[in-house]
Amino acid sequence: MHRVGSAGNTSNSSRPRKEKRLTYVLNDADDTKHSAGVNCLAVLKSLGADGCDYLFTGSRDGTLKRWALMEDAATCSTTFESHVDWVNDAVLAGDNTLVSCSSDTTLKTWNCLTDGTCTRTLRQHSDYVTCLAAADKNSNIVASGGLGGEVFVWDLESALVPLSKSGDAMEEDSPNGISGSGNSLPITSLRTISSSNCISTHTNQSNGYVPIAAKGHKESVYALAMSDSGTLLVSGGTEKVVRVWDPRTGSKTMKLRGHTDNIRTLLLDSTGRLCLSGSSDSMIRLWDLGQQRCVHSYAVHTDSVWTLASTPTFSHVYSGGRDLSLYLTDLATRESLLLCTGEHPILQLALQDDNIWVATTDSSINRWPAEGRNPQKVFQRGGSFLAGNLSFSRAKISLEGSTPVPVYKEPTLVIPGTPGIVQHEILNNRRNVLTKDTFGSVKLWEISRGIVIENYGKVSFEEKKEELFEMVSIPAWFTVDTRLGSLSIHLDTPQCFSAEMYSTDLNIVGKPEDDKVNLARETLKGLLAHWLAKRKQRFGFQASANGDVSSGKDISHRSLTHSRIEVDFNAENDAMVYPPFEFSTVFPPSIITEGSHGGPWRKKITDLDGTEDEKDFPFWCLDCVLNNRLPPRENTKWLIML
């Protein structure tokens, strides 16, 4: 996600000091599937005899999903969409609250058993938020850690209390989301997407809540774990030490040394006395926090250990990581067993009774047998080995040809994902993008409609690019990235308005052939067509209900009375969306942007219902769509056929 500064205005200007970017994310697949690697897993056990378990997954595609789990099937029942970058971790804090963190520097809370409503956005971190930890017996307490060397402890009950000031009242005090003193937004600001899908921004400064900061990390934090009671917190990262904290005060209690590389994962037993750590040094270590020392080291993996999951009694540990392998280790006897291997590094594990869910850098999620309630059953199959004490011991075994044979060959259930895009090329016509995904399929996209117009299958990307080369010259008006596993199209003003084509070259029927069409303006109209229609319907209904038969322009004027946009009611506002700019409603793109309040948000274009505050959109975007007005530029260029 392209990060931009705060939307502060000068006292003499009616426009933001720095214009915001608008991004739209394209997809051509079912929304019930992830399109990038899955970073995190959380299992919610059934609360009733007739209910089912739920699996929550968070992905590098920026979304979370809820899966209803049956014996031989998993059905996606909800997609949680609001983060604008990778979802890095998620925890359950109570029966109905899901907490997620992201590379967009935020935490978000969700009502996990409803329709995917984001209830709050918590802002405190200055960099990517990489990990979370929750207290089981004190479900209000959640800790977060990130790349900024920051660890915060949140009391969700206090953080999520109703605010004393409404968004409108705050707007009167601060028209642009900036305090009267000229400072930036308060330390913690919360963005709500209500059940009606209306986006509004609030801050919790009015109730004075600030999370507890556990200060002491000098470098990035990658792992957290918290005791069930919420009285003990452990953290680890690039400093190679395990730090122990009192989360109630943020004070350090001890520091444990032993690992020789980054600490990537941590676990605590239910009492908070025993701690397991996994590291990029390929080692798993067991710490006795009462004795403040490492009591066992396990050389099981041949590469970085990225995730751990323990049995309920903390007698055995499942581990996975960069070596593509899932191991089961008896912590008392040091006996280890290779359960399975795959094609992708393992990012996170989640036990569900006698099964274990495995998330990897692939978009699919696999379920494997684990015998979590009686792991000794697995060891009866044979093939185990004794874990060494030194990291090179497993590597030596591997080199000598005695690599363990996996117990299981195939998963018992696969939740399929869609292949993510890993390569792209913008073609010379500046309307088509050629892509290649993880399956090797090459596709041609028309970005002004957000659809795939040709699927070439598994062909040479370079040869197809040469074949599609055209001798045309048109200015670059958008940029592209594939960080989320999909095509993200970025529009920045005024550059995005630099490209024009003749209507005849776009095959627009009924428009004079020599009329020039601005590609960005028409694309914006297509993206916001649903929002404009809902907005018109909403204000028209309100006017009709009040017995007001005023013109549509009057309705628009009333809706923008408190807006920062000065509507030119004499401007010709052609709301028609031409066919080359009609976006799919079957696979609708998502918009990622931020308004004057400075907080990014993400939403499908078909979920925009007209109730969104105009201040949540970039100024230049609405000025273009509502007023047909473009920013001034020195040179206008259009398509030249050679």
Feature map (PLM): residue ranges:
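Loop/turn segments within WD40 beta-propeller blades
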Residues: A42-C52, A90-N96, L132-S139, L224-G230, ...
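C-terminal scaffolding/assembly regions of large eukaryotic complex subunits
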Residues: I453-L642
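Conserved strand-to-loop turn within each blade of WD40 beta-propeller repeats
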Residues: G58-D61, C101-D104, S144-G148, L156, ...
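WD40-repeat beta-propellers
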Residues: L64-A68, A90, C101, L107-N111, ...
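Intrinsically disordered, low-complexity acidic/Ser/Thr/Pro-rich linker and tail segments
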Residues: M1-E71, L160, S166-P211, P369-T412, ...
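WD40/WD-repeat beta-propeller blade N-cap
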Residues: A29-V38, F80-V87, L122-V129, G148, ...
